[in-house]
A protein has these predicted regions:
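Mixed-charge, Lys/Arg-rich low-complexity intrinsically disordered regions
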Residues: 1-5
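A broad helix-preferring feature
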Residues: 7-10, 30
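Structural motif
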Residues: 13-14, 34
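Short beta-strand-centered aromatic/proline hotspots
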Residues: 15-25
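Short, solvent-exposed secondary-structure boundary/capping segments
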Residues: 26-35
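Intrinsically disordered, low-complexity, charged/polar segments
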Residues: 38-52
Length: 52
């Protein structure tokens, strides 16, 4: 996740789609598109980048 640009959309293994927002100390704050909830991701989490 640390390799994708800020503001881009990505998908995790279970199909949920998120938008990368900000860096909080060591973890990345991301917004789930469908529910609007915020989640924190470890920098080495494997995600699939989606075209905007």
């Amino acid at each position: 996740i640390f390799e994708i640009p800020m503001g881009s959309h990505f998908r995790i293994h279970n199909g949920k789609i998120f938008k990368k927002i900000a860096l909080r100390v060591k973890r990345y704050e991301c917004l789930e598109i469908s529910s609007g909830r915020l989640y924190l991701f470890q920098p080495n989490a494997e995600v699939e980048l989606l075209p905007n």
